[in-house]
Amino acid sequence: MTETPRRRVPDSPPGRRAVLKLTVGVALTLPVAHFVNAQDDNRRKARPQTNDRLVFAGGDRKGQLITLADLPAGGPPLTAYPMEPTANVVRDDSRLNQILLVRLDPNRLNGDTRARAADGIVAYSAVCTHTGCDVWDWQPASGTIKCPCHFSEFDLKESARVLNGPAPRRLPALPLKVVDGAPTVAGGFVGRPGFETGGG
């Protein structure tokens, strides 16, 4: 008995069922990927939340965790963004999340400021309440900070109250606590960050 040699059948194109399975698989994964990206976008835009860590907003250490050692007594202030601690998502998709951090003498802080401070470190919105400029002109002798655009001056020892200039209200404060040697958000902004529309 002689065997006839087997001939290889050429590959055939995928059948309808295989194409349908592939299409359904792709269709099911796309919304999940979009949902995950949308969640990250929402977390990046969200205002600071309790237990957020604080990271450098720029410079050589951008995105790195800020520790107590990074904040010497008397300043200078650091600009930070909050970072969601479980997924390490930096909330940097809104300028209104920029935070000023500075360590002051706790004995010079008023009661409200001291209650929101951690180890003398105070945190405020870094966005002026007048027209939304970045506030950064530090005055170490007085413990104040000025907006370079229209010269509003805020007293960081007294809940960032307005001392001079056209800003209509104080900089919103951000309560802090210390966790594992790092300043950490203890609650949401006290006041709305940003400026009032129509401010001149």
Protein language model features and the residues they cover:
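Acidic, glycine-rich flexible loop segments
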Residues: 129-136, 140-170
